[in-house]
Amino acid sequence: TIFKLASEGLGNKAYIHERNLKYGSDIALGYVASQRTWGDTDVITPEMVARSGLRWYKNRVVVNYDMDAKNLLKAQPADSEDGINKLLTMSYVTASRLLLANSFGTLDAEHVYKLSRIYPFHQFARSARPLDAFTTDYPRVYGMKLTDKWSSLTFFNEDEEHPQKISIKLSGIEGRGGAGLHPDKQYYIYDFWNDKLIGTFGGNETLEQELRKGEARQMAVREVESNPQVL
């Protein structure tokens, strides 16, 4: 392929970008460093999130996905911070590159601060997987185990007009409605953007949250220890 020729000619220090998944093929994997999962756009939609999210097993492993540039000033819903929080969260969770459509001169201090909350993107070859991929009509829960005692959990309300209850069984099979935690252990769950401790839960319990319209709730899950912990 043309990507093989480019890779061989430019060498292993080059980063080759495959323009668009629409015209892309797995035949280019191993030669391209990144791949677009959507056409030209500067917004984020539920369809974009799902397209990248359901390819979690490839993302950061064999290729880096991006959903084209994102305009922070167009984030929806626009009447709360949930819009930009959602844009940043789901770009991080379901892609592995965030291209800005804005120059820094158009962003205020709060925008720059929020950007700083998600950078740097992690570099290891693993992405959050949709934990409800085979049990719901649309993937709304993403999880990634960072260590044996620390996991990342993301609830995503794709509806920008109405709140929505989202839940996940903390133990159980990942991808089939479970988060894969140990049923006999206790866990602290901390809400990142809302900056609060949600509570302590048994691994055999179900976590249910009511999300505001268009909210992405990013949570840290830590196994309870007998010593003070940073959540």
Descriptions of predicted regions:
Residues 3-109:
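Glycan-recognition surfaces
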Residues 5-6, 79-80, 87, 138-143, ...:
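Generic recognition of flexible, low-complexity loop/linker segments
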Residues 23-28, 99-101, 106-113, 160-164, ...:
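Flexible loop/turn segments at secondary-structure boundaries
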Residues 88-133, 225-230:
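Aromatic- and carboxylate-lined catalytic core of secreted/periplasmic carbohydrate-active enzymes
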Residues 91-94, 99, 134-181, 220-222, ...:
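Carbohydrate-binding surface patches
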Residues 106-121, 169-176, 180-192:
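Active/binding-pocket-proximal capping segment
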Residues 184-206:
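Solvent-exposed beta-strand/loop surfaces of large extracellular or lumenal domains
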Residues 200-231:
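C-terminal beta-strand-rich structural cap/linker in extracellular carbohydrate-active enzymes
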